[in-house]
Amino acid sequence: MEIISLPIWVIFFLIFGILALVTALTALFFPIFSRPKKYTNSEVPAVDSEDFLQALAGVANAPVQSGGQAKLLNNGEQFFPEILEAINKAEKTINFMTYIWTKGKMSDLVFEGLIKALHRKVEVRIVLDGFGGTGIDDEKLEIFKKAGGKVCWFRPAHLGKLTRFYRRNHRRAIIMDGFVGFIGGAAIEDKWLGNAENPEHWRDSMVKVTGSMAENLQSAFIQVWTDTYGEFLVGRKFYPHQGKHEGTTDSTTSKHVSIISSPSSEFHPISNVFWLSIKAGREKIYLTYSYFVPDKTLRNILKEKAREGIDVRILLPNDYIDGNTIRWASHRYFEELLQAGVKIYEYQPTMIHSKTIVVDGKFSIVGSANFDIRSTELNKENILCIAEKGFASDLENTFFQDLKHAKQMKLGAWKKRSFFRRIRERFASLFEEQY
């Protein structure tokens, strides 16, 4: 038998290709850390108790704090003018971190405000994600840098670092003078303008925070900035004394816990915070998420609470979603949730991109994290847990306003979906670790 002789360079590239394929498949299909099969606890305190907040702080490795205010802002019509106003009022520092930044009207207005701030001698820094920020207007970015602005990119694509590339910086943290900040689901792209009036304008929420809540956002920004840019940000201009700012508020003072997560560690607190907060529910639990692919432990606690007679409702996107495969993966779990009594709705007018939980009208979670494995294990994320009835009431009212424009999924009809749809769901769920 004749033996085929291959050039050494061909053998090298074959071996390199096989190793690259094995590495990619390992990264895609193996979880970052081993999850427990279930969480157990005889009783979790109610969300309005001090014991609950201390338990939350324990699993999040973050302290319970008091002070600061939170104001809910729905859709670009509300939050974008507030962001621009805060930029225009900044006196010392602006730190701007978002996942997506794409050229357009919204980008132009933000750059205009940031460049004017630089001319006022305000220090301005931007963190861009190496994947989500690639649509930015390069010309405007150069003008910004020439005016004195600083920019860093989180994990841009590099050959040999592809297993790190798929772990993204998904955090949202916009902070002015260390005292006023914004957190939520929105980013810099024209689809976040307007009032969700059509499919070209998304439904989303941001939260304006002040005081110690804003300082927590500052920490989420500075952690990424220091690790990526190599500059330590210290001093009163980043962490001002709160006393001199008291009284400049929109709402009542709140107790809160701020959580930031990173893929560099096997400690992933967001999943634990989600579970504990849902477990603590006594009457009603309302979730709104753009991407919903929970692991088994989170699905089980949602089903458990629904079987207890708690009003558990989940609001998700319909086919206006910007990624059909994640929606199909989500659909795989609808039947088991509906059978347990969970009520599921799909928002009809446009893509809904909000990321919120409100429990018993007393406790809320807002931030960048989705209800999926990518957010709990892979991405850098930041969320804010707020124990304040006024804010929770605003969030709950918004939830029911959104339900007026949503279609409820019914178990009987859902069971009749086609064989093709079921196969599609199973195929999509193979990649649920990555959505």
Predicted regions and their residues:
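Charged, low-complexity intrinsically disordered terminal segments
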Residues: E2-Y435
